[in-house]
Each structure stands twice: as structure tokens, then as C-alpha cells.
Curated annotation (Swiss-Prot):
One of its GO terms (molecular function) is carbon-carbon lyase activity. The gene is mqnD. It comes from Thermus thermophilus (strain ATCC 27634 / DSM 579 / HB8). It is an enzyme of class 4 (lyase). This is 1,4-dihydroxy-6-naphtoate synthase. GO terms for biological process: menaquinone biosynthetic process. Its EC number is 4.1.99.29. The tartarate seen in the active site in the crystallographic structure may partially mimic the substrate; it is suspected that the tartarate may resemble the open-chain form of the ribose part of the substrate, cyclic dehypoxanthine futalosine. Catalyzes the conversion of cyclic dehypoxanthine futalosine (cyclic DHFL) into 1,4-dihydroxy-6-naphthoate, a step in the biosynthesis of menaquinone (MK, vitamin K2). InterPro entries: Menaquinone_biosynth (IPR003773), MqnD (IPR030869). Substrate binds at residues 55-57, 107-108.
Amino acid sequence: MEALRLGFSPCPNDTFIFYALVHGRVESPVPLEPVLEDVETLNRWALEGRLPLTKLSYAAYAQVRDRYVALRSGGALGRGVGPLVVARGPLQALEGLRVAVPGRHTTAYFLLSLYAQGFVPVEVRYDRILPMVAQGEVEAGLIIHESRFTYPRYGLVQVVDLGAWWEERTGLPLPLGAILARRDLGEGLIRALDEAVRRSVAYALAHPEEALDYMRAHAQELSDEVIWAHVHTYVNAFSLDVGEEGERAVARLFAEAEARGLAAPSPRPLFV
């Protein structure tokens, strides 16, 4: 059987989640071929329907609901997990300022667009944002992934925690990313893949040290301390199953996107 291409990012939470599935520690209903790419690349590919199974920002999912459906397992959603805006010093407002952003299809960018208007986005790969801010190439940066743990090393300060802002505004956890299956795979296979991803998450949680070498191999020279901080922040009970509260959070995010004309309403269910 031809291998199914599975896209996910090289960030520790994704490599932790998929370690067991990729290495045969848990059974998959079909052979899988891992494709590791930056999340914004995966977001753009999803607009083309390129990968049958892929990690995706929830903000991008809102644009591809007719083609993809979210698995209940494997996602990144929670409290205290949000993107941060950082700068070299305190800022009163972002209007008119250049802000380095990790892509216009990311949930982080969507949140920043809700929070502030009039800033000038400068799109770069997420791991270039901190150096750009520190060197004065831009006035502020919108940071995601491990950057939320490393920005003090660059002498930068937090301007706003967009996750905390979302939680205060909605009372809900923040949906960041999900694992999506292309609907043409069929419901039976999609449900089997969902269960396989859930088992992979459970295996990693039960044997965390076993995944460390795989995480290190893709973690862009991060220390073990930062790798584990990343995992403990982004992998949680919502990663095993999005649950009712998670579903409400995603529905709220999509409603915000639809209200601003950033996504079309869809009658399709959000999750398999």
C-alpha cells in the first residue's frame, strides 16, 4: 500500500506527539510518510489540498473546511499557550509599527489582527523573528512555538500575551493547531487515523524520555530544558481529545473569523 503523507512541524510538541506513530510503537491503519515543514508552509499547502493528513493552524482550517476535517486528537489547544508580542522595550500601541509575523495564515496572526489594527506585518519564518526584533529590523515581533521560552535571551520584553487576552475575552482555552485529514480519505479511515494519533499521544505521555532523541533531532539546537517546557506547555488533555470545551473554543474562533469575512460559514462538522 502506498504511504500516506503526514505533515507536521519540527517543533517538540509535534515530534513528541508523532514519535510513536512514525517509529512503529503504535499501529497505523496505513503506512505513513512523515513530511516535516514549518507550520505556515503546511498552512499554504492545505489551501491547495496537497497533503492528505497534516498539522494546521486553526485559523487556516477555517479556510479549508470543505476539503479537510479535524481529528479530535493530536492538536494544540489550551490555557497559557498563546502567542506573545515582544519588543526591545515597552510599547503603548502597535499602530504604524513594523511587526514581524510568522505567516498570515497562523492563528497567532489572526489573534493579533483581532487585538490591534494599523500595524505593518512583515512575514518571516518564525525562527527569524527574535533576531530581527533584537537587531532593530522591526519594532516588534509576534512569536510562537519555542520562542515564548527564549525571547529573554535576546534582551526583549513582552508587550502582550495574546493567549491571556483571548482567555479573558472569551473565557475559553485558545485553539492553536489541529491535525486535519482530507475528507476524500473517507470517514472510516479518518476515524482510524484519529485513534492512531490518540494512541501515539498516549504512548509519548507514558514514555516521554523515549521521544527525546527524535525531538532533539528536529529542535533547532534547543536545550533539553526548553524542549520539555515546550512539550509541557502544548501537549495536554486536549491533545488526547479536544473535548466539549475545546469544540466550543474552536467554534468561537471560527465565528470571529466569519464575522470579519476571513472565512465562509460551513455546515460541515468541525471534528470527525
